[in-house]
Amino acid sequence: MSSIKIECVLPENCRCGESPVWEEASDSLLFVDIPAKKLCRWDSLTKQVQRVTMDAPVSSVALRQSGGYVATIGTKFCALNWEEQSAVVLATVDNDKKNNRFNDGKVDPAGRYFAGTMAEETAPAVLERHQGSLYSLFPDHHVKKYFDQVDISNGLDWSLDHKIFYYIDSLSYSVDAFDYDLQTGQISNRRSVYKLEKEEQIPDGMCIDAEGKLWVACYNGGRVIRLDPVTGKRLQTVKLPVDKTTSCCFGGKNYSEMYVTCARDGMDPEGLLRQPEAGGIFKITGLGVKGIAPYSYAG
């Protein structure tokens, strides 16, 4: 077993860092700071970080096949021109719910951008429940709604054979699976594949590795856990020096490194003294497993 190394590669002080995505073409990590309305790009070679501030909370970002990026900003799916620091609205959801915003999002293997909504929090993980929905933005910019009654729409990914969609609604304390139709984007037959244990706290962002196992960041649990979605067993726990771990992705050379985002919001001064790296970007090496490249939006 190789020895696992955890380091804070960027002391960013994110209020709520989220949605890490590796951009292979630029050796960069994209991520967002939701309440700060910031989209960030960290160059792993120069160690420089560029930040763009939007006019509403930015909750997820993804690569786009035609260049640039797509992001969920407020309740809008947007296309981003990084150089011009501008966003073009592609679609808007939840028009009837003024207190809602998007949360986590990710592109599926067919190039659709899946993302879900939630009510704005009054404090971390404190919010009006059942207000969210799960959507996807198709390449032709039409939006499909899958279901509503969501608390905090969160981590999502697809099995390596593209037949299963994995999804987290945080306050269900469960990682769920659906049958998934790659051609149509339909999902069906929801079931739970893992229920979190008490010390694991709240399931947040998620990614899949090259062996088809799931990695889940546990908010307030200070860890990422590796799950086998077939057996429902936890295979590994990696603890970080911060409690509010929010999301994870693979990146770096051959996708052999894991990047983890975290949050500072909701921590008291004593907690921040104890965890000075809270809000930073962490890199985990030596996991002995690789990830897969992120999919790009096809529209």
Curated annotation (Swiss-Prot):
Coiled-coil regions listed: none
Subcellular location: Cytoplasm
SUPFAM superfamilies attached to this UniProt entry: Calcium-dependent phosphotriesterase
Cofactor note: Binds 1 divalent metal cation per subunit. Most active with Zn(2+) and Mn(2+) ions. The physiological cofactor is most likely Ca(2+) or Mg(2+).
InterPro entries named among the record's database cross-references: 6-blade_b-propeller_TolB-like, Regucalcin, SGL, SMP-30
Example of a GO cellular component annotation carried by this entry: nucleus
A Pfam cross-reference name: SGL
Cofactors, names only: Zn(2+); Mn(2+); Ca(2+); Mg(2+)
Modification N6-succinyllysine occurs at: K144, K244, K253
GO function term, MF aspect, one: gluconolactonase activity
Record's keyword annotation contains ATP-binding: no
Binding site for a divalent metal cation: E18, N154, D204
Record-listed E.C. numbers: 3.1.1.17
Biological process (GO), any one: intracellular calcium ion homeostasis
Primary localization class, coarse: cytoplasm
Keywords for the protein's UniProt record, in alphabetical order: Calcium, Cytoplasm, Hydrolase, Metal-binding, Zinc
Reactions this protein catalyses: D-glucono-1,5-lactone + H2O = D-gluconate + H(+)
Active-site feature positions: D204
Keyword Repeat on entry: no
Subunit and interaction comment: Monomer.
Annotated function: Gluconolactonase with low activity towards other sugar lactones, including gulonolactone and galactonolactone. Can also hydrolyze diisopropyl phosphorofluoridate and phenylacetate (in vitro). Calcium-binding protein. Modulates Ca(2+) signaling, and Ca(2+)-dependent cellular processes and enzyme activities.
UniProt similarity note: Belongs to the SMP-30/CGR1 family.
Protein name: Regucalcin
Organism, as annotated: Macaca fascicularis (Crab-eating macaque)
